[in-house]
């Protein structure tokens, strides 16, 4: 993401102009937008024209519109973002008050104005515009006949390919059909890696499986690379890291990212920090349950007692349509930071964020136990 201009007043009203440069930037943009914001961008509008003879025709024109945002639609797989609202500035093609849908596109600037820019949104802009926050992890989670090729970015887990094929069982004295099907499967996975992994960006490729599937696949992969002179694979052989997983399904990526060998390799990435924080929370919940709580009421009470050491919260909560609810979570984050705590904001499109959402989307590791908090947990109504 490229920041072109930032004009925010002391009362936190103002506007920013940004250019999304890659697919993940569309996800960041989705998280910046809220109903009631003002969005200005270049867009296509179908307009009717009347010729001198009186015949009416229509054509598509590119124009710049400013709309008041009413609905926001994001396709996470295609990374497409469509924003619908009413036109609030005079335009030669579109009447004031007319509805229009702007499709935001990579490499095309937009200006976003808000009456109130909160700390969460401003921090997201800062991170999105920081080159250090880039996608640098790929993962192949596999078992015989099933593989998922994913890109793990700081903000999301993107499924790039799912390969599924039937592998006949081994038969006593005749393994030919099994071996042929397995080789064909490995070939499909190899082609998926070549098609979907950009080795100029990716620093590590995790190959995970139960049993010996990962070893057998990597042996096949690099023998085939030598045979076919696939230099892209041979030159990046050192980036491949084999790890255990319980299955070849996408959800197994969570356990893969918790593997000590993986966390050591990915120690500087935001994704690794989130995985570690969630792992620490589960350990605390198991061994010292009076220092690990989830749910907004419990966490707020712990924060009032200055007990929150680490706050875990999903970005989905900051997209809440109800402004007071959204503000409540922003205040919690700001307060924890002011009290010296650490805040980890999880992406709801990341496997760790999906898990945290199952725990209400907000959790905390405490510095010390808080009296009466455990008693309230069982009777608390979550908002």
From Swiss-Prot:
Family (UniProt): Belongs to the eukaryotic release factor 1 family. Pelota subfamily.
Assembly mode: Component of the Pelota-HBS1L complex, also named Dom34-Hbs1 complex, composed of PELO and HBS1L.
Record-linked Pfam families: eRF1_1 (PF03463), eRF1_2 (PF03464), eRF1_3 (PF03465)
Protein name stated in the entry: Protein pelota homolog
Cofactor(s), names only, from the UniProt record: a divalent metal cation
Keyword Cell cycle: yes
Organism, as annotated: Xenopus laevis
GO cellular component terms, semicolon-separated: cytoplasm; Dom34-Hbs1 complex
GO biological process: cell division; nonfunctional rRNA decay; nuclear-transcribed mRNA catabolic process, no-go decay; nuclear-transcribed mRNA catabolic process, non-stop decay; rescue of stalled ribosome; ribosome disassembly; RNA surveillance
Origin superkingdom: Eukaryota
SUPFAM superfamilies in the record: Dom34/Pelota N-terminal domain-like (SSF159065), L30e-like (SSF55315), Translational machinery components (SSF53137)
Keywords of this entry: Cell cycle, Cell division, Cytoplasm, Metal-binding
Role summary: Component of the Pelota-HBS1L complex, a complex that recognizes stalled ribosomes and triggers the No-Go Decay (NGD) pathway. In the Pelota-HBS1L complex, PELO recognizes ribosomes stalled at the 3' end of an mRNA and engages stalled ribosomes by destabilizing mRNA in the mRNA channel. Following mRNA extraction from stalled ribosomes by the SKI complex, the Pelota-HBS1L complex promotes recruitment of ABCE1, which drives the disassembly of stalled ribosomes, followed by degradation of damaged mRNAs as part of the NGD pathway.
Localization (cell): Cytoplasm
One MF annotation (Gene Ontology) recorded for this entry: ribosome binding
